Design a protein with these regions (language model features):
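Residues at the starts of beta-strands that form the adenosine-phosphate
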Residues: 3, 26, 50, 126, ...
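Short, conserved loop/helix-junction motifs that constitute active-site signature segments
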Residues: 67-74, 97-99, 121-122
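Rossmann-fold NAD(P)-binding glycine/threonine-rich loop
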Residues: 81-120
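Active-site-lining helix/loop region of Rossmann-like oxidoreductase modules
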Residues: 126-187
Length: 187
């Protein structure tokens, strides 16, 4: 069992957090404006966590890390945010505000609907991610029901975000349904 703080109370954080609870993990939900009794303040949630999932609007990442960076020391931080209005989808330039954290990029390339029901036509969806290969992230992705595909260390963040841009284009520009996923096939 892993203790996890889910920062963000929207569809992505709630759906992933509930999947982790069903898998047996201890999950605390946090937001800037906690609504007791279920939601904690961000600092309180981080204090009791080994892993932190960032599931807030992407533009808020720099401020959150500036305020809570020291508290993230020694923790794995999974960045699931997307700043769709920004120049880039991620804010990795803010990661140095939490120098003791180990960052991974995951859960940002599919719609939250795939985290609630991770298969289509009997096929399990793949989730591309990057970050440290020894941080337990693959297990947490599998615990949501997805097949993890690691594309490298955190320096591969733009590769992962390329898959996100593809998903956004297919869904929002081409009109495909949000329950759209990717599958890597090999021979």
């Amino acid at each position: 069992m892993t203790s996890i703080a889910v920062i963000g109370s929207g569809n992505i954080g709630a759906t992933i957090g509930e999947a982790w609870r069903r898998a047996g993990h201890e999950v605390a939900f946090a937001s800037r404006s906690p609504a007791p009794p279920e939601t904690l303040g961000i600092g309180d949630a981080i204090a009791g966590a080994e892993v932190v999932l960032l599931a807030i609007p992407g533009g808020g990442v720099p401020d959150l890390l500036a305020e809570h960076g020291a508290a993230l020391d020694g923790r794995v931080v999974i960045d699931a945010t997307n700043d769709v209005a920004g120049e880039r989808l991620h804010h990795a330039e803010a990661y140095p505000s939490a120098p003791g954290a180990r960052f991974a990029r995951a859960f940002n390339t599919l719609g939250f609907e795939m985290f609630a029901d991770p298969s289509i036509g009997g096929e399990t969806a793949d989730l591309l991610w990057c970050g440290p290969d020894d941080a337990g992230v693959e297990r947490l992705i599998a615990d949501v029901g997805l097949r993890p595909i690691r594309v490298g260390g955190i320096d591969a963040i733009d590769v992962v975000d390329g898959a996100c841009r593809l998903w956004l284009t297919l869904v929002f520009s081409q009109g495909h349904p949000r329950r759209l996923a990717f599958k890597m096939l090999t021979d």
